[in-house]
């Protein structure tokens, strides 16, 4: 009898165990793959953007069973150290998104070539702007697909033009009269001293300027040489010889110096610090008639509007006929240390769908890289800022510095970048009036960094 009771208890236990096992969710091979998306190489880390991206993740995860996504956020200031730490700890994310050309350059060897995926899937790229595709085609690989671009345009204050009775700059590209020389002539008429004399007047006092005709270029110095027919990278094609004290680099820096200290149309960095405190752009003051900047300045458009009626025009041609609209861009990159590159590509192409691309550019502030989305973007921006001609931004895409781009990789990237910016700072601050010497110093220092790199990477 005891043996029978024990058998019955054992049978009931086994039946319960089998029932429990059958009802327990399965793990292991059937678990969804989690794709981690690193956000920090550009836009996307402010509270509103993070909330919007997390909503997108929830939507994706609700509609996909085999793959789940999660955004990992970092501030811009910490993105380099945080990403490096993840790589060192074998915790590489599966996507970096959004990421620009500078972010790609910072970790260039880490990103995989996506062209095999494009070929395998016969991915249709015909809707993307040609220059936006060219921007991502590097010598040895293609990194990402175009999400959005930030072309440069000439911003101008209509009220200051009207007060000076000066015609507005042209909005259409192809006007051969719109040159940097013409821009300086125009800027002189709206550069005023305390007595109301403009910079074209013999009575003008450059020590008492109250209004400037031009605010300069808002980007790094590498956006400048291309306007003067030079290579924005300032070195030979094999990256072994610096070319920074001649041609486009020298001409561009001389132009900056002359705009401040000869024609007096641009404020120096000292003026900017004393007159335009608390502003990201001098144009926000209502005391600057024109400046050139990327479309990512859209976050400041409300301040532009407060300063007066503003509009946009084409970028002027340089002295050798070069019309260059410097551009920044957003894309994605798949790390070579990702454990799930195939699934990362699948997620990336989902993010690149037209509807999602439009939505993401609304979050990040970019212009969608798909031609089919242009009219929608123009209509949306025009509704918010009816005085602006936003078609000019779209037209500028055809003139962007796609290859090489002003943020493209060079050896010892950060050292070369910082040294170049320091050279420009010496001119903008008035620390040096000898442009040739500044560029000779830059040439020597950069050549040293190139030699250092190639000695370590023969």
Task: Name each region found by the language model.
Residues 186-187, 237-273, 315:
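Glycine-centered hinge/linker elements that transmit conformational signals in sensory
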Residues 73-82, 174-182, 268-284:
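Short helix-initiation/N-cap motifs at beta->coil->alpha
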Residues 75, 99-153, 181, 200-207, ...:
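Hinge/lid segment of periplasmic solute-binding proteins
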Residues 115-128, 171-175, 203-207, 212, ...:
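Short, solvent-exposed loop/beta-turn-alpha elements that line the ligand-binding surface or hinge
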Residues 387-445:
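C-terminal capping/gating helix-and-loop segments adjacent to ligand/active sites or protein-protein/ligand interfaces
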Residues 2-3, 7-11, 15, 20-108, ...:
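Conserved N-terminal structural module of periplasmic/extracytoplasmic solute-binding proteins
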Residues 139-147, 152, 179-242, 288:
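Extracytoplasmic/periplasmic solute-binding protein
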Residues 68, 140, 262-264, 303-369, ...:
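Extracytoplasmic/periplasmic substrate-recognition and gating elements
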């Amino acid at each position: 009898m005891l043996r029978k009771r024990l058998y019955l208890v054992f049978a009931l236990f086994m039946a319960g165990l089998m029932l429990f096992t059958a009802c327990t969710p399965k793990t292991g091979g059937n678990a969804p793959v989690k794709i981690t998306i690193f956000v920090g190489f550009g836009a996307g880390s402010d509270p509103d953007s993070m909330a919007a991206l997390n909503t997108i993740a929830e939507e994706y995860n609700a509609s996909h069973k085999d793959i789940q996504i999660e955004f990992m956020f970092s501030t811009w200031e910490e993105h380099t150290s945080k990403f490096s730490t993840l790589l060192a700890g074998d915790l590489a994310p599966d996507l970096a998104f959004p990421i620009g050309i500078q972010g790609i350059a910072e970790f260039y060897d880490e990103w995989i070539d996506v062209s095999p995926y494009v070929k395998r899937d016969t991915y249709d790229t015909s809707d993307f702007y040609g220059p936006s595709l060219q921007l991502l085609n590097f010598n040895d690989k293609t990194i990402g697909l175009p999400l959005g671009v930030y072309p440069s345009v000439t911003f101008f204050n209509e009220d200051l033009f009207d007060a000076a009775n000066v015609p507005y700059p042209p909005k259409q590209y192809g006007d051969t009269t719109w040159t940097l020389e013409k821009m300086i002539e125009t800027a002189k008429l709206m550069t005023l001293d305390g007595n109301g004399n403009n910079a074209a007047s013999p009575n003008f006092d450059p020590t008492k300027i109250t209004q400037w005709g031009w605010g300069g270029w808002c980007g790094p110095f590498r956006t400048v040489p291309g306007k003067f027919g030079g290579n924005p990278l300032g070195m030979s094609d094999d990256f072994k010889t610096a070319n920074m004290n001649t041609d486009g680099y020298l001409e561009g820096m001389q132009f900056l110096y002359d705009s401040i200290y000869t024609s007096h149309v641009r404020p120096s960095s000292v003026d900017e610090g004393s007159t335009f405190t608390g502003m990201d752009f001098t144009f926000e003051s209502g005391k600057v008639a024109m400046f050139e900047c990327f479309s990512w300045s859209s976050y400041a458009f409300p301040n532009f509007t407060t300063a007066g009626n503003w509009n946009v025009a084409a970028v002027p041609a340089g002295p050798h006929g070069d019309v260059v609209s410097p551009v920044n861009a957003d894309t994605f990159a798949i790390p070579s240390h990702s454990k799930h590159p195939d699934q990362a590509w699948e997620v990336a192409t989902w993010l690149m769908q037209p509807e999602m691309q439009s939505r993401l550019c609304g979050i990040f502030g970019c212009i969608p890289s798909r031609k089919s989305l242009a009219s929608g973007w123009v209509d949306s921006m025009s509704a918010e800022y009816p005085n602006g001609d936003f078609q000019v931004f779209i037209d500028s895409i055809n003139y962007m510095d796609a290859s090489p781009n002003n943020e493209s990789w060079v050896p010892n990237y950060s050292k070369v970048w910082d040294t170049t910016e320091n050279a420009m700072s010496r001119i903008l601050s008035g620390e040096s009036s000898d442009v040739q010497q500044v560029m000779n110093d830059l040439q020597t220092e950069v050549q040293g960094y190139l030699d250092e790199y190639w000695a370590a990477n023969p």
